[in-house]
């Protein structure tokens, strides 16, 4: 499908059910959306959100090629998701929240759009200690999902403070690549949490 960079496989472990509504934050070329679309079937639906028109165009082209009819792509930002309150069963995201400077806002938006009892499965880059200032301020490191990586304990605290419960780390493996000392603190995190049922 092209133009999809990730740090995990949220769809593979999200356990999307037939008939569910799934929303993908930062859908890129749409690969995670198309995988989710197969799981939810024709009675379900998948919404891909991306902030770049070029990616939306690519994803729509890919949807046509794959003859996928239960996926829609929307232009939007993850800090202000263009979706109704309490309307989604499952939110997925693959290495996107690290790109936001407003992670608390992103988690609040996820909480807002999830139905009571709904869940998210997110793969993201975090660290086990604060990054050096020069890394956090480097545009190149932000683009590669590194510069915006939060310390894992802070990331988990944001999720909990938003109101999610049953927070579960599904995977946390050290990132590989690079020779700089700080790279050894990078972690690929996959996390699941639930919006409490009413």
Segment roles from a protein language model:
Residues 104-119:
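A short glycine-rich, Lys/Arg-flanked "PGG" loop and its adjoining helix->strand segment in the class I
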Residues 127-146:
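Short, glycine-/aromatic-enriched active-site segment of Class I SAM-dependent methyltransferases
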Residues 18-80:
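Class I SAM-dependent methyltransferase SAM/SAH-binding core
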Residues 165, 172, 176-198:
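Core SAM-dependent methyltransferase catalytic element
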Residues 1-23, 62, 135, 182:
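Class I SAM-dependent transferase core
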Residues 148-163:
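Short alpha-helix
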Residues 22, 91-92:
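Hydrophobic beta-strand segment of the Class I
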